[in-house]
Curated annotation (Swiss-Prot):
Statement: the UniProt record of this protein carries the keyword Membrane: yes
Species name: Gallus gallus
Job description of the protein: Involved in the retrieval of endoplasmic reticulum membrane proteins from the early Golgi compartment.
Membrane topology: Multi-pass membrane protein
Sequence similarity: Belongs to the RER1 family.
Record's protein name: Protein RER1
TM region positions: 41-61, 63-83, 140-160
InterPro entries membership: Rer1
Keywords: Golgi apparatus, Membrane, Transmembrane, Transmembrane helix
Biological process annotations from GO: protein retention in ER lumen; retrograde vesicle-mediated transport, Golgi to endoplasmic reticulum
Chief location of this protein within or outside the cell: Golgi
Claim: Heme is one of the keywords in the record: no
Length: 196
């Protein structure tokens, strides 16, 4: 391998200015993501605010309905992945590997692990809104369409998809919404001491 053959390196073997700039930009972005991780409510409020701004923009411009429809389908897809277990119980039920321990399903504890974790769901949904917002600045994405048909398609698709997901949840007895491990409180310490 000769000098300068690796990606991002200049002729002299040092990383190029552009490569260093984008590397640093990626590090700053990742740092902000890492800092925002514990603030779930704040993250979702910001995302809802961006969504509201996007809807106002589409309403005022009276266009970009195809972009909005695509954003809705994308968010529906993310939501279904968020509600789905990482390992599909129907695939586990059909396996012919023979018996495994424990033999009764009701005795086995299986924690619910999502196919799409909450943070990745939020991150993807926010990026989707920002991309859709960027698309509204380009007239090429403003395809003329009769928007009530798109609304009806979306409502129909949402109802069919959620009905199937709820049936799956009932059949395999899992609830995707839990609040974590229960916390048990002991008796309160009133501060009194006993003299012996």
């Amino acid at each position: 391998m000769s000098e300068g053959d690796s990606i991002g390196e200049s002729v002299h073997g040092k990383p190029s200015v552009v490569y260093r700039f984008f590397t640093r930009l990626g590090q700053i972005y990742q740092s902000w993501l890492d800092k925002s991780t514990p603030y779930t409510a704040v993250r979702w409020i910001v995302t809802l605010g961006l969504s509201f701004i996007y809807m106002i923009r589409v309403y005022l411009l009276q266009g970009w309905y195809i972009v909005t429809y695509a954003l809705g389908i994308y968010h529906l897809n993310l939501f279904i992945a968020f509600l789905s277990p990482k390992v599909d119980p129907s695939l586990m039920e059909d396996s012919d590997d023979g018996p495994s321990l424990p033999t009764r399903q009701n005795e086995e504890f299986r924690p619910f692990i999502r196919r799409l974790p909450e943070f990745k769901f939020w991150h993807s949904a926010t990026k989707g809104i920002l991309v859709a917002m960027a698309c509204t600045f380009f007239e090429a994405f403003n395809v003329p369409v009769f928007w009530p048909i798109l609304v009806m398609y979306f409502i129909m698709l949402f109802c069919i998809t959620m009905k199937r997901q709820i049936k799956h949840m009932i059949k395999y007895r899992y609830i995707p919404f839990t609040h974590g491990k229960r916390k048990y409180k002991g008796k309160e310490d009133v501060g009194k001491t006993f003299a012996s």
